[in-house]
């Protein structure tokens, strides 16, 4: 060992392992407006104090490692380290705590959701001192959110492009999701759009398979859109799924969609990845395409109550990365979604400023400044009897998407679309007249069905269909 090395190693450096809480648990810390704040649900291993567990999360997701290293002396840890500044027990849960961690903004690359998640959740979830760990919420400071483009267009620009105001938009996922030829697929799209829907949709796993290559699907769907527009006088769209095995192929598909003149493309943002999603969002902004986002794989990450990442965090990340629509559960359909939690992250998607509200799972006040909003999409196991509840829960700025609830109509796809459009228009009119959709919803649908045989047939088919299971993720 050289004398120079000995001198550096001996000044202020003591090798060995020390408790994380000595450095990273700082209960007196006053958070800054520029800090990224995180709320983690921490379940420590037996014998691990909550302060040590919270400090370990702060350390391992910022500057720390398992032992003291001499290169700590070459930088300012006080400037760059994450800090666990508050810990509170979770009411009604044994050995679970909410650990609040503050991260200095300089730890993160500007405009990169990928880098943000790599730091905050990239490594710490496998930490042995923790039995389980869940990221419940993030506070994104305005100084960081302003480094993101966000949604390609946002809610108001989309309404202006479509010339549709004062009601939710209606969609339909084409079924069967796999196996149709491109021509038959386009036929189903046309029938749904001419029946009164605003959009139809590729399912999340429709990419470019042997039974239907992407280019053929794009062409037949574009033909269906133009034919339906000519017949109805309304602007129509189909979410053409541009998700692909490489970013280059994804952009190539988006370019072809733009050349066809269609209004919207689609991406599976979790399986495709945030880097790919942000790239596609930038392309869509530059080329006038709307971007629909599917959240395929989300339940792998967010469904367990004590481990993973809550969807409200994934929703915030999507708003930063970019998307004009995102699937957000239904509350009333076949997929997971507790009402207050769902409404909490719906507000985080749409609104500019959202106050802290623990009753809805919102741990921090979030100010998005001028970042455009995202339309929540209600999809999964919904039908005409759900229309009053969906209209009341989600309001006008939403997309209500009926797959089986359109294509399962006994008279075919177009009558299924008519039934949904009539039900929606009836609910919107009743709401505008001051009627209570939650209390009078079934009566409103029955009244509309008297003059719409398509709606009457749909009401008869789905009158007994319910998906009543308790939500796994509750407050």
From Swiss-Prot:
Catalyses which reaction(s): 2 (2R)-3-phosphoglycerate + 2 H(+) = D-ribulose 1,5-bisphosphate + CO2 + H2O; D-ribulose 1,5-bisphosphate + O2 = 2-phosphoglycolate + (2R)-3-phosphoglycerate + 2 H(+)
MF terms in GO: magnesium ion binding; monooxygenase activity; ribulose-bisphosphate carboxylase activity
Residues with PTM N6,N6,N6-trimethyllysine: 14
One cellular component term from this protein's GO annotations in UniProt: chloroplast
Site (Transition state stabilizer): 334
More details: The basic functional RuBisCO is composed of a large chain homodimer in a 'head-to-tail' conformation. In form I RuBisCO this homodimer is arranged in a barrel-like tetramer with the small subunits forming a tetrameric 'cap' on each end of the 'barrel'.
Stated family: Belongs to the RuBisCO large chain family. Type I subfamily.
Listed name of the protein: Ribulose bisphosphate carboxylase large chain
Lineage of origin: Eukaryota, Viridiplantae, Streptophyta, Embryophyta, Tracheophyta
Gene: rbcL
